[in-house]
């Protein structure tokens, strides 16, 4: 089961694609230890789970270039 739940994630970001790409990018950063942890405590031990928790908590948001906004 996905933790945090998908409906909690889509409440913050309305696109599953943006959730996936943002989480993947952040997970790579966490895995490479470039960034420090944004939450005091994580439920997940894996970088992707940690990234999803950060998205659900509103600590990170996707960045969409202006040319893609229409």
From Swiss-Prot:
Record GO biological process: DNA-templated transcription
Keywords: DNA-directed RNA polymerase, Nucleotidyltransferase, Transcription, Transferase
GO MF, any single term: DNA-directed RNA polymerase activity
GO cellular component: DNA-directed RNA polymerase complex
Keyword Nucleotidyltransferase set for record: yes
Keyword Nucleotidyltransferase on entry: yes
UniProt EC number: 2.7.7.6
Gene3D superfamilies given in the database record: 3.90.940.10
InterPro entries from the UniProt entry: DNA-dir_RNA_pol_omega, Pol_omega/Rpo6/RPB6, RPB6/omega-like_sf
SMART domains: RNA_pol_Rpb6
Catalyzed reactions: RNA(n) + a ribonucleoside 5'-triphosphate = RNA(n+1) + diphosphate
Origin superkingdom: Bacteria
Protein role: Promotes RNA polymerase assembly. Latches the N- and C-terminal regions of the beta' subunit thereby facilitating its interaction with the beta and alpha subunits.
Protein family membership: Belongs to the RNA polymerase subunit omega family.
Subunit-structure text: The RNAP catalytic core consists of 2 alpha, 1 beta, 1 beta' and 1 omega subunit. When a sigma factor is associated with the core the holoenzyme is formed, which can initiate transcription.
Protein name in the entry: DNA-directed RNA polymerase subunit omega
